Amino acid sequence: MKIKTVEFARSAFNEEQYPKDNLPQIVIVGRSNVGKSTLINTVLNRKNLAKTSSRPGKTRGINFYLINNKFYLVDLPGYGYAKVSKEMKKQWAHNIETFLNTSQNLRHGLFLIDIRRNPTEDDFLMINWFKHKNLPFTVVLTKADKVNKSESRKAVEDICKIFKINREEVIIFSALEKMGVSQVLSIFEKYA
């Protein structure tokens, strides 16, 4: 798929701010600092479209990116970040839950996990939500350049066992090496 146009449509903090058109939405979910913004910038070939930071918690609203005027890529705030107030965590959880439960246009989930880390309880909750809703999702193992090939293969095997998914539902991704970009674009193409 060729990315022709990318527009930062809006950052929403409540349901009234979501786009009102009926374009399909692909949502990106994962823990804080897992590489969601980096994946967006790499796959869309835009250097600073999504703001990145080495400090977790950079994305606070629900960010909507309009791709080729055909679909939205939706970047949710990361979960699991310990260094914010309980009130802020509660607000983020509420915003994520509200979006996931009210969006009528959600078509696919890109579920990001750092290839070096084990899934958390929050990761299991999120995967189970997608399964419960019968929504297609793909697990994207990020930061693959940080491990060798055998560690990468083992991580994929482990994720498939843990989440009870097929190998085709997992993408190994590295922004540094541009690994996995074409597979993510193939998912986009289904909704363009």
Swiss-Prot record:
Bridged cysteine pairs (disulfide): none
A GO biological process held by the record: division septum assembly
Domain of life of the organism encoding this protein: Bacteria
Binding-site residues for Mg(2+), renumbered to this chain: S37, T59
InterPro entries the UniProt entry points to: G_ENGB_dom, GTP-bd, GTP-bd_ribosome_bio_YsxC, P-loop_NTPase, Small_GTP-bd
Gene3D superfamilies tied to this protein: P-loop containing nucleotide triphosphate hydrolases (3.40.50.300)
A molecular function GO annotation: GTP binding
Residues the entry annotates as binding GTP: 30-37, 57-61, 75-78, 142-145, 173-175
Family stated for the protein in its record: Belongs to the TRAFAC class TrmE-Era-EngA-EngB-Septin-like GTPase superfamily. EngB GTPase family.
Function statement: Necessary for normal cell division and for the maintenance of normal septation.
Protein name, per record: Probable GTP-binding protein EngB
Organism of origin: Thermoanaerobacter pseudethanolicus (strain ATCC 33223 / 39E) (Clostridium thermohydrosulfuricum)
